[in-house]
Amino acid sequence: MARARIEQHWALAEFGAAELGDVRRQARLVQLARQLAERPEASLPQALENGAALKAAYRFFDNADIAHEKILASHVVSSLKRLKGHQVILAVQDTTLIDYSTHPGTEGLGPLHAKGGHGMICHGTLAFTPARLPLGVLGLRLWARDPEQPQRRTTRRTRPIEDKESYKWIDSVRAIAVLKAQLPGTRWVSVADRESDVFEFFTEAQALGVDVLTRAAWDRNVEGPEGQLFAELAAAPVVTYKQLALPARGKRKARTAKLEIRACALTLECPLNGSGRGLHPIALWGVWAYEPKPPAGVEPLDWKLLTSVPVTSADEALERLDWYAARWGIEQWHRVLKSGCRIEQRQLESFERLRRLLTVYAVIAWRILYATMLARLVPGMACTAILNDDEWQALYCRIHHCPAPPATPPPLKQAIRWIAQLGGFIGRVSDGEPGTQTLWQGFQQLIPMTEMYRIMKKPKLTRSSRPHKNVGND
């Protein structure tokens, strides 16, 4: 498991290798990342120290020579270092809409959906371990739809895949293949939701040697006695059972679902429409997790998964389900990005400026999520994994109302709970572990607290103790 320390100047580790054509731009990026991370919820004028810093930030985000891909590239290099030594990496990709409908004057944005909305599309790829520790943002595609060319269902089937938004899945798996070549001993699995159930996505991943794990959206034709995917899965044997804890989501209450798990080998036939020309049938494995007896009035959990990773036993079927559940991690990242970093409230004048800014916040949001999950997965490690000495000492003194901290730093799990306590976490037995929201709110309280601690612990010079010149003879 990755146990790399996040140094005091973490921004240097994540952005210090950015190749932006000028070392001054690189230094500005590192400084901006550090300042924005200290107050992720604040507007730019609030987060930056003075008018000069704000003006420099606007110049940076307005610079057409700085591509957002170059901003992210340095973080990807750091992420690959964290990935070394892992046998399996789950490259989870997902799409979210960034809504700027309240800023209609921003140039270069486009429609979000048929019913309205104005903003950009964000398609990210995050690296997770099978234990769901996020190790970095591997890819970030940001684009705005053309308002002159609405997405028409009538022409979608006949258009080439390169002209569809679903090409994002293929583009991302190609980027994963490039990273895979740098870690040849690691199995890379692209994990995605039902929107990625695109035949060309499966064939491209197979050609590149990247495994896939996706949720089926279409009842495709398959080779075999049943002829259809869903019927073939229903006819497969039950290999095991599982109880799955479902977190609260929207109006859905938290509950435990009792699932029966079926699994079998499958061969998907090529699509019958024009998009299937030149393709060949593809062999995959299917896993169906179904809740036969849900609570009254509750829709049953129903996951039909397709994967290129073999499923030959009950344990392997359960492992694929656990891997797919890692998708919740990228949804948490979206939440931190929108609610914690308040990216949809940012007011810059153009799409390109927003794209550069969002890339910086994408890494800041990852760091918050990383700290949260690290405390859950490695609770006994020292809190210096994410806090410098002044931070944990200030935190300890504040929580315990004492003037001096102990010599030994507390465990990471305890420190995280204290930080969350600053953000409103009560810590009752029924509350479970702190979430990302109370954690980022707590970090915001910790920053000024640490600054005051640094000031107060400095040696104090009184009038009588200050050095002075002798005015008489020695």
Model-derived regions, located:
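Single, function-defining residue in the core of a domain
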Residues: 1-106, 114-121, 126-474
